[in-house]
Each structure stands twice: as C-alpha cells, then as structure tokens.
Amino acid sequence: VFAKEQKLVDVKPAENFYPKISTQECDSNCLLELLEARLYLSFLSEFVDQHDQFLSNIYAKLLNSITDFDKNLQKITSVKLAIIIPEKTIKSYSNTIINSSIAYLLSQRAEIKVKVFLTGTEDNHKIRSTLEQVQAQGYQYAIAALTLKGVNQLKDYSGDMKIFIPTLHKNNVSFSNLNKNIIFGSIDYDAQVLALLNKANSDIAAFSDGSMLSSNLNSRVLEQNANTRFYRVEGEKLDFYRLLRSQGSLNNASIFLNTPLIKTALISSQLRVYNIQPFVLLSTQINYNSTFLSLTQEGDRKNFILANSIDNHDDNLSYLNEIFNQSIDYNWIAYATSIGTDYFYTQFLNTKSDSLFDEKIQNSQILYKVRLMKGSKASFEELK
C-alpha cells in the first residue's frame, strides 16, 4: 500500500512479491515491502523494533485495527503518489509532510502506492534530475516540499505531472508564467496580518528573534504600517529593561509577537511584570498551538488575539496524525499537505470520494479563511 523509501531506487511491484520462510530478521526494507504487498499479518509477525518511528506507528495502528484496516479498500489500480523531499533543507518538516500524506490516505482507505524521493538539497541539478526520475517512473502527482530556492528551479517546468507545494504561498514567487500544474498550499501570512491589524490601533510594535520566519513576519507588518517599532530578542535571556529604554514605552501599543512560543510566553509575562498595559497582543499562526494555553497565564491571554487558518473537522484524520506524533489541528504544514493530498485524491485519483476539507483552490493557490482566536482556560475560541 505504502512504500516509504530512503534511496532513489526502484521497488519491485507488489504483485511480484512473495514472502518466503526465513530465520533471518526482517529489516526495515523487508517490512516496507510487506506493507506494500498488503501482507499486514506477516508485517505484524515479522516486526522487530527498528528504531523507525514510521514503522512503529504503522505497527501500532495495525495491531489495534488489523481487521478494519484492510476492509473496503478503494480498488484503484496503478495509482501512485510521489513525495519529493529536500531533507537537508526542510529538516524536521520532512516527516511532517510524509506522515500527513500517509495519514490522509489511510483515512480514505486508499490503495495508493506512495514513494518518497529524497533530494538532499534544492540545488538545480538535484531538483531537475529528481523530477525527471519521478516522471520516468510514471508518477502523475507529486507533493514537493520546496522552499523559494527549490521553486525557482521550476521556472521552466513544462511537464504534465501535477505538483503540489505545501510549504510556499504563490505570492512569494516573483516570476510569472508558472506552469498551471504547479499548485501552492501555504497559509497566507499577509491575510493574517491584515486581519490582526483590524483589531489594532495606530501605535504598532513588533517583537522578533532574528529567525527567518520572524524577520519575514516583521516585513509583512512593516508593509502595512511603515511606523512600526521593532524589538529584537536574542538568546535565552531577555533584558526587557534595556529594550524598553532603547525603544520606548509599549503602553497602549498594539504588539505583534513574531516570536516562537516560548519567547512569546516570556515576553507576555514580562509585560505584566513591568506593569505595561498594551492595547492588544497579536500573533499569526506561529503561536497557534495547544501548548500556548499551558505556557501563558490566563490573565495574559485575555488581551491576546491569534490568527488561525486551520479548520479541520475530521476526527479520524486528527487521530491518524496523532499516531504519527503530530497534530493536524495545530501544525499548518501537516494541514496544508493534507489538503493537497485530498485535492489529488478526490479530484483525480478517486473522483467518487468526498473531500474532507472546505478550502478551495483558485489561481493555483489554496484559499484559506482567517479566523481570529482567543485562548480560554483549556481551548481556543473564535472571536465573533
């Protein structure tokens, strides 16, 4: 059913695989072949912990529901999905994208072969050679976890294979005349910033930590308000007194916290310690996480608004992602990847199936709603 591979090598088709009795241990490749051949009971009997989280999660799922797992599978033949991963570039997002794709296909009982192509980096020759290999092996649909550097290698792409890029928004691409078969899936940070500014006053300030994402968010705020004051927080220690002396008071300011969750919690608590009363605290998707509720004080959250574009309604999909140790309800990369996989599956691979999502695709970009949220005692609630 699923073939997750770490090398760009050909895999024998399922119909040519025949298990043989052996006293030798079934290694990771052997276990993956058993999965591809739908020999689930053989997989369970041969499974030995390989310190492979992917295989361990599948083992747990099969162990709990082996009867239902193979029941009423969609009978689709010769259907394949490629996943292109520059693992040295996107690092931890690699597993997120692979796992969310597989979790979605499991939720649909889809009999689809998945193959992962690792490119290492996004160098021009590696992206191009991988695309050629993917197409040569007959794949018509691919999820490609590319950054802007990788997408720049697709300027001249003219193939018929449909490519979904969950990691980038189309607005970030500077060149025009992009192949219509390339679709973008990132959330829209510009739309989130605009929605948050509707809750702000004219005195805008922003905190950052110097990271690429933080700097990117700062630039988006600055585009909307040229008078924004910036406060940079680096390292583990926060010298709040020095920041205030150098940049001025934050009383009655609308403060964007373009910082990771732990620093956001620290900054919000320091505002309280220094008896600073902002007009409002604001954050984009970067801080929309269940951990936000435990790291911040309830009093600090009363005047804190977060923008969120994740709107998952499928409990089974949430459960399957949790098996892979990730949350589709808070991880926008997992959510975007799931929407892209859903698009391929329901629009092309199995048109009789229903989409699990409300989002639409327009001009080669997923359109997301922006919901403004507040953290209560134990959950997030949408502002009305």
List the predicted regions and their residue ranges.
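Extracytosolic ligand-binding ectodomains
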Residues: 2-384
